[in-house]
Amino acid sequence: MSRRGTTEEKTAKSDPIYRNRLVNMLVNRILKHGKKSLAYQIIYRALKKIQQKTEKNPLSVLRQAIRGVTPDIAVKARRVGGSTHQVPIEIGSAQGKALAVRWLLGASRKRPGRNMAFKLSSELVDAAKGSGDAIRKKEETHRMAEANRAFAHFR
């Protein structure tokens, strides 16, 4: 056991324009090869496209999309007596948001389209409406957890 004290949980910083932590989470997840300015450009263009498509506040659409994709429960592989079981576990809000952001970006990368800003804006609008690949991924995870409910006591 470590003799050091517990580390404080890092608080996510806000982005410079929208002053929002979710936007910063998106930027940090979309980041490739340390090109943060390009990541900011992509996110801001996507938010501008959302504004044009829906004529709503893009931050509220983003919040709604992330709320819709955030899972309550997930499955974790656990080895018990030579066989591996998918054990359902409850997820905290921070971990759920991180998963939601990851799924949204993965779904938008798979989408056909011109550029990442366009694909991300389309995926966010779809997720806010309750459709799209990210929503399907959440439902699939919930189905897996429900199917393996018998192994919940292995936690």
UniProtKB/Swiss-Prot annotation:
CDD domains: uS7_Chloroplast. The keyword Iron does not apply. It is found in: Plastid, Chloroplast. Transmembrane segments: none annotated. Its main location: plastid. PROSITE patterns: RIBOSOMAL_S7. Signal peptide: none annotated. GO terms for biological process: translation. Keywords: Chloroplast, Plastid, Ribonucleoprotein, Ribosomal protein, RNA-binding, rRNA-binding. GO terms for molecular function: rRNA binding; structural constituent of ribosome. InterPro entries: Ribosomal_uS7, Ribosomal_uS7_bac/org-type, Ribosomal_uS7_CS, Ribosomal_uS7_dom, Ribosomal_uS7_dom_sf. One of its GO terms (cellular component) is chloroplast. Gene3D superfamilies: Ribosomal protein S7 domain. It comes from the Eukaryota. Belongs to the universal ribosomal protein uS7 family. One of the primary rRNA binding proteins, it binds directly to 16S rRNA where it nucleates assembly of the head domain of the 30S subunit. Part of the 30S ribosomal subunit. This is Small ribosomal subunit protein uS7cz/uS7cy.
